[in-house]
Structures are given as C-alpha cells and as structure tokens.
Amino acid sequence: MDYAFLPPEINSARMYSGPGPNSMLVAAASWDALAAELASAAENYGSVIARLTGMHWWGPASTSMLAMSAPYVEWLERTAAQTKQTATQARAAAAAFEQAHAMTVPPALVTGIRGAIVVETASASNTAGTPP
C-alpha cells in the first residue's frame, strides 16, 4: 500500500490511534528471554552429555548417546540464535514505528491546517473581484 496516495487525515489517524510500539518491545523481550533459555538448555545439555560420556560412561552405548544427542544440542543452539534474531527484528520494527510516528503530523494539527485552508479559501472567494 502506498500511503502517499492517502489523505493526511487517514495516515495521521492511523498512526496516532494504533497500539504503538509497546507490544513489539514486549515481544522482543519475550523472544530474548526464550533465546536465553534455549541457549542455556543447549549449553547445559551439551555439558552434561560431554561430562557423562567423558568421565563416567564408556563403550558403545556412550558413543551412541553422544552421537544421538549432538543433533538435539545443535537444534537448541540454532533455535536460540533464530529467536535472538527475531527479538532483534521486533526491536527494529518498534524503532521504525517510532521514527514514522515522530515524522507524522498529529491529527489535531492536520485538522487545524484543513480548517485554516477552508477559512482562507472562503475569505479569498468573498474578496474576489474587489479592488485591493
């Protein structure tokens, strides 16, 4: 949608009546928390498996457990990185909204300008044809 083709009253009203950036910032914080939990789980799980198979448990079962758990740890690490990226993108969306909001003329000012245009137009048409 090209907002440049919409009247300023519509763009201004939409920008000022919406929920604002807070929900995006809350979502970013939640994604950050999830990323931290996933990273912690990956680190702890990997550490426990490494200690268990390296010090207390030997043989084919140990080797098999280590091989089978590696993809899970990798998945946790990859998912933690992706959730961190999602948090970063949510913060970027909130920042973009804040910038757009700051650059948007408030609805009351748009209404005032429209009113002034109407008054000036009416005044100009009333004095049309009269000598200066």
Swiss-Prot record:
Which InterPro entries does the record associate with it?
A: PPE_dom, PPE_sf
* Pfam families in the cross-refs: PPE (PF00823)
Additional observations: Was identified as a high-confidence drug target.
Family assignment? Answer: Belongs to the mycobacterial PPE family.
Name of the molecule in the record? Uncharacterized PPE family protein PPE50
- What species is given as this protein's source? Mycobacterium tuberculosis (strain ATCC 25618 / H37Rv)
